[in-house]
Amino acid sequence: MRDKLNLLIFFIAALLIALGLRFTPTISFAGLILLLAVVPALMLRFRDFFSREAVIAGIFVLGLALNALIGVALAYTKSMEFGMSLLSLLPLTLVLTANVFATSLVIRIDASGKEVFAFYFWFLISVGLAFLFLLPTGGSAEISPRGAGWFRFVEFPILYSELALIPSAFCLVFQRVRTFLFFSPFPLFLDMSWSSL
């Protein structure tokens, strides 16, 4: 019964996100919160699936491709509405996908359910707090910032790779979840120089 409830919440969240892209970001945000809550439970339910090497590699490649496409689209779009819709997808493609990839590696080293939940939510909290330091303070951010398209093509994939790989590297080297909880926000601080470009 709990598995069916988690799946139902997952599909409701996906529907809210889709509606939010069409109508208002507030709906999309509500869907994102629901989605974040049920993802780790579903990953633990399908533990064997998410611990496969092919699945883990596929999640990583999917995140790279999605973030590259969004980066290029943001660089060239002239529509404010379309640009805002793309920006509303970034929490999913940039943070959630990286978190699912890293959490899959945690599952692969046979971490307990409590450790998986602890890592998943600590990843979200630490990355969210780190992003606060990178938010523009001038109030004049552009949907299509100045800069070459090739730079936008690599910017989001590089940031995504840092979010996904740096915490995961500590997980694989030390085979302990608690050893890299401290390092989860570290990739964002590396990118402070990017925000000034």
Curated annotation (Swiss-Prot):
Protein localization: Cell membrane
Cellular-component GO terms for this entry: plasma membrane
Protein origin, superkingdom: Archaea
Protein name as catalogued: Uncharacterized protein AF_1579
Organism in which the protein naturally occurs: Archaeoglobus fulgidus (strain ATCC 49558 / DSM 4304 / JCM 9628 / NBRC 100126 / VC-16)
Organism ancestry: Archaea, Methanobacteriati, Methanobacteriota, Archaeoglobi, Archaeoglobales
Membrane topology: Multi-pass membrane protein
Location, primary (coarse class): membrane
Keywords associated with the record: Cell membrane, Membrane, Transmembrane, Transmembrane helix
Parts of the chain that traverse the membrane: 5-23, 27-46, 55-77, 87-109, 116-138, 153-174
